């Protein structure tokens, strides 16, 4: 009888410890603030390139709650291509070429976390990305009209859709994710002959720097 009671007590204690361990594992992803570093590649198009690709690096923040969260990201893709724009002066209308170097992106998106496991955390989300060309080199003499045209096509907003998975290890997590964003025809990195999506594939690390809520309240 004593052996039976001891086994029962040990089983109960094991269940409690297992539940506490599982809850702790969940809390390390839920209600957390992650800082991350990433690298990968992105696709792009331009007036002279219908299907280009470039490496990228970046940093990001992921703020999680129970079922969703907020994602912020800054990155740069090392793009080198040629774009163009229509220049209108008093005498004629013609196309001028520009050299394009580097793409900077700021992304903000809402995330949801379906089907969570203890150490594996898939996620999907959507939001907006601000795209900006880092360097634009005009061929020929600049004019006030051409400067305005370049400024108008140098930056563009676009919706973005993100999906990925994060795996938790000690002392940090690793992740892989992909994104898709429709190209805006008013932006230098677009090609009017293709209705193209810009795709990115990224992988990196995230470190949990603390709680995203005030647990003292």
Predicted regions and their residues:
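Membrane-embedded beta-strands of outer-membrane beta-barrel proteins
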Residues: 57-59, 106-110, 124, 161-163, ...
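Short glycine/proline- and aromatic-enriched beta-strand/turn motifs that initiate or cap beta-hairpins
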Residues: 19-70, 206-217
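Outer-envelope beta-barrel architecture signal
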Residues: 27-35, 66-70, 118-124, 155, ...
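Outer-membrane beta-barrel translocator domains and adjoining extracellular loop/strand segments
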Residues: 47-53, 82-89, 134-145, 186-193, ...
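Residues that define the transmembrane beta-barrel architecture of outer-membrane proteins
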Residues: 31-33, 51-57, 100-106, 120, ...
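Predominantly the C-terminal beta-signal and adjacent terminal strand-loop region
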Residues: 79-85, 161, 166-217
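Gram-negative (and chloroplast) outer-membrane scaffold detector with strong preference
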Residues: 60-143, 207
């Amino acid at each position: 009888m004593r052996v039976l009671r001891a086994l029962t007590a040990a089983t109960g204690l094991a269940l409690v410890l297992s539940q506490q361990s599982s809850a702790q594992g969940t809390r390390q992803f839920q209600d957390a603030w992650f800082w991350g570093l990433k690298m990968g590649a992105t696709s792009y198009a331009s007036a002279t390139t219908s299907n280009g690709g470039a490496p990228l690096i970046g940093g990001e923040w992921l703020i999680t709650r129970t079922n969703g969260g907020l994602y912020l990201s800054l990155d740069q893709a090392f793009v080198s291509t040629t774009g163009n724009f229509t220049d209108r002066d008093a005498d004629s209308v013609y196309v001028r070429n520009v050299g394009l170097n580097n793409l900077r992106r700021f992304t903000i998106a809402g995330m949801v976390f379906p089907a969570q496991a203890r150490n594996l955390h898939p996620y999907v989300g959507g939001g907006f990305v601000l795209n900006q060309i880092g360097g634009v080199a005009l061929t020929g003499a600049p004019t006030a009209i051409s400067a305005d045209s370049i400024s108008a096509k140098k930056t563009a907003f676009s919706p973005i859709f993100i999906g990925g998975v994060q795996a938790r290890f000690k002392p940090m997590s690793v992740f892989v994710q992909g994104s898709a964003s429709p190209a805006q025809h008013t932006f230098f990195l677009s090609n009017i002959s293709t209705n193209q999506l810009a795709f990115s594939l990224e992988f990196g690390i995230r470190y949990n720097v603390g709680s995203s809520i005030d647990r003292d309240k």
